[in-house]
Amino acid sequence: ACGRGLCGREGFELLEAARGLALIEAPFVPVRTIFFDQRIVRGSQVVLLGAGMDARAFRLQWPTGARVFEVDLPEVLALKEQRLGGVAPRCIRVPVPANLTGNWVVALESEGFRPELPSVWVLEGLLLYLDESLVKSLLAQVDALSAAGSTLLADVIGWTMLWMPQLQPLHDFVRELGAPWRFGTDEPEELFEPLGWEVTAYDLGTVAAEAGRWAWPVVPRVIPGMPRSFLVEAMKPAGRRAFEDVLE
């Protein structure tokens, strides 16, 4: 019920308007949601970057004392508070009004984030809307704030998804909404190589097929030029310094 309220009427209207666009019926969102849900609750300090109307603070069973920091634009979080109407979270929820292109790190730490503790970072439905340079700088900032044992969860679309003609109606739709897709890669592991994180990139089709939610053949990654998306789980191993420290 909380999730439906956060979506608002316009959320359902957008979903209806998007029906019939290429690949829109693929079960990407529910499969991604379950994948992240199973991993997020392992942490006692969680940061949602570009949190939007995420309802996990209210619907998941959290460890005692867990803190969930929700980072997003001030106007987004203000609308979220209005729609929540006083609903109580199941954790210590900490809204952090900040722009990810600005000084969000200072805002996060001022709200009580403790970089010496392992964290779970969630970049859900975010990276595809950012330029590649911003994607890399954002990951470097996350690395600098992460203690050993921290986890990062993200979804990444394949490069083919940015240009294939069959997706043009969907690209036109999101562009009109002011949210064009900007970033994709067929090798998401390479984003983390400079950071030294241990990363596993799961093909969405494989994850969905294992869950009985995929109606199409799963195409091996060695076959290029195919539309695909990835669910990424990365962990910062012990003994790793922040990437920024290595450069000094």
Residue map of PLM features:
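A short, conserved alpha-helix within the catalytic core of class I
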Residues: 103-106, 129-144
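Rossmann-like AdoMet
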Residues: 1-47, 53-98
